[in-house]
Amino acid sequence: MSSIARPPDPCLVAVVLIARSRAGPRFVFHYPPRPLADNALRPPKARRTSRSRSRQNSKGNDSTSSDDSHSSSDEDEEEAPSQNLNNSNNSNNNSYIAGSRRSSNFGLDDSNTLSENQRPGSISSSRAYLRKRGANSDAETDSGVGSDRQEDGSRESDGPNRVPWESILGLPVDVWEKLLSPSRSWHKRRFELGINDLAFVGWPVFVREDGNWRKQRRKKKKKQRAEWESGELGHNDATEDSQDDGNDAVAASTETLSPFSALHPISQRPSVPNSRSSQMSSEPLDADDKDMMTMFNVVFVLDPPLLEYSMRVREIYDNVIKKFSKALKWEQSRTNYVWRECQHILNIKEKAKEKRSSLNSLYADIISQSSLARAIRTLYTSISASKIASVTLSPDVSISLQIPPLTSTPYLPGPTDQAYPGLWLTTADSISPADDPMTDDNSAPHQVLAKHFALLLLDNEATIIKDVEAAGGALAPPLVHYIRCSSPTKSFVQISQISGMPLPTIQFLASHLVYWRRARAIPPLHQRDTYIVSPNCDLSKLEVASAAYKVAFPTLPSLPKMLSALSGTPRPYGNFIPSKDHKATYFLILAWLLRGGWVTQLRSFARVKVSPEIKMAVELAIRREEVDKYLSKGKPPVATSDKEDSVNDERTEGSDFDDASSSSSSSLASHGSGDATPMPNRFRADTGVDLTHSLLDQTASLKTSSLILLPHKVSPLESRWLDEIVARFPDNAPDFVGNTTEVDSATPIPAKSLKEVWPTYLKYFNGYDALEKIPVREGLKRKLVSQVLTRLGLVTGQSSTELDPREQVLVSFRHW
């Protein structure tokens, strides 16, 4: 599998709604009407055909059902009985007799006819398997496994007369009713079932034993907090999962269910008090109702590629399946919404069956009359197209769902990788690093943006503000204020200082805009930084982009001219700015180019080089220390007892064995235990000097240079190398004047000794952190940083001051 990051690919085939009442499970609705036919025009992908072939004669388990590691605890744990991980709704081993097809890309077909050379998928985790039938047999349920629901039997007996909506993916719906109706042990857990090349993933929700869909809690007075503080981002469920379904938690979850989206204004959003009052006014369901719903399960049918299976299933489960099911659960607890819609859909299907309506006519009626069916259709069409799905369940509940798109990639696609032209090419990570003091250890990953990044709006500022104001809500005023204050040239910290807004609030608002595809977090734009034409830019859109560029900047150089200039020898962006009066306009051009993926920042990286001279000096110093340590003991060099001689002989033999078999490394772990590290050519016992505890790495060559990979996690030997490097720095440094350009002043700046600034810079010489981070994170002048790096060996061009070879200790390279 290639290491290239890929954009969202939901691989969504269908969405299925299963409901179970006291009478038994019911297959309520699925979309699209013909999943295989509607997905037949999809681009071919590397599907899991190899696994299907390898399992053709195997009776192994084809399905997986795993517990959700983030299973919600917002209801009593005593709801679930003993954990019987059998995802069948019957305790006996049930056998389903069903058709099998291999003519489609998914390994399934809408045909109900069978052929003897085709195999069924095995479903052992549900205590079921699909058995072959003759070529003229119809797929129907085995007589030993009937539905819990007593019906007229028409669905089992009238195979040739079965209506088209009573079969999906080549199997009758009564088979799917049992397969997709797990036991109560799967309550609010990740339910996953594999059949052939398809994965069925859901988040089943069961009613409580008292007939309610949530735990009734007494009201608790809590400090009121702003509406947007309760998880409106829609992508942080960590706090919600750890809360009970009390009134306050429901109010908080309402805000998550109805996120303020700058993209899709949602009307009729309820306030928190309204949500609470409507929820408290709902009456508990009658436990004696013979037809009350006891479980519902929204199942997403996926067809992910084999090598990306886990990643694709996880992203759609975390971002769509779980959140949509939570929204339905909340609305079911308030108004019995899900069961009411299920009954309505089933009634429409019964009437259509009596009238012998066509499939298209039936679906037109269902979607026009059922808000839940419309929500499922919207969810399918939007998520399958990697768009944001804005779903309205009722006038009081709306929810926006999406799989967060990939905004950048650090890799260029290889010969066998699918190319995504126009994707931002960069290694810059906008997420707070682990050593950032502003990072919250308890926060979910990928939530906190690094405080030294800036915000680049992906649309016109006026357009975004207009959408935000139209949507309204408590989040609108701070969002509008932040959008007006933000600038791609100012970091979040700088915006906080200028606007007076708290830094965590700015990071939250910026994360909100990034999540809802309205902005992108980038390193702040600066005239001293270097920008080049992105190797991943989409030149097929050059003509269209040139027209848009001309409208935005009619009096400035055209887009082809700007790209041509940036394609030359890399140099600071300030060299392209004609004068100070053009500075703001040229930054707008740079932001426009970055927004479209036309350019990327060329960044510098470096590692510390250890020369053979440094290595030899350290080795001699260590040898000298060992000799001095031995002589300081004041013991006779040879006068030892027989017992001591025996011990020394054993130590010598063991050390010789280590010399031949071990290869010590310069990592911290290899020296942290205090074990002896043998050194070749050490003094023998007859001289009385034993240097077995030397720090020297016997595998390191003294004739070649070495690189220190992690300066902040060095081994003892590497630490001695660094100390020797610093010791050789000159104490006094002359005034230094760097490159002079139109935007750089040639005024000399008094340079400090490198011994003083070395600890500040050293941690960035790991080959991963761009050197452009140093002035931003350390609060230093960029020109001063450039001078220090030039003295240390960073190649930046001709210098007006002769460089000292003792200070040239860096090996630098540049990329995006």
Swiss-Prot record:
Function (record text): Mediates inactivation of the TORC1 complex in response to amino acid starvation. Required for meiotic nuclear division.
Species annotation: Emericella nidulans (strain FGSC A4 / ATCC 38163 / CBS 112.46 / NRRL 194 / M139)
Compositionally skewed regions (Low complexity) per UniProt: 82-95, 660-676
Biased composition (Polar residues): 101-127, 268-282
Signal peptide: 1-23
Similarity comment text for this entry: Belongs to the NPR3 family.
UniProt biased composition (Basic and acidic residues): 148-159, 225-238, 641-654
Gene Ontology CC: GATOR1 complex
UniProt keyword list: Meiosis, Signal
GO biological process, alphabetically ordered: cellular response to amino acid starvation; meiotic cell cycle; negative regulation of TORC1 signaling; positive regulation of autophagy
Primary gene name: npr3
Pfam families, A to Z: HTH_NPRL3, NPR3
Protein name in the entry: Nitrogen permease regulator 3
Annotated segments matching region Disordered: 26-166, 213-249, 262-287, 632-684
Biased composition (Basic residues): 44-56, 214-224
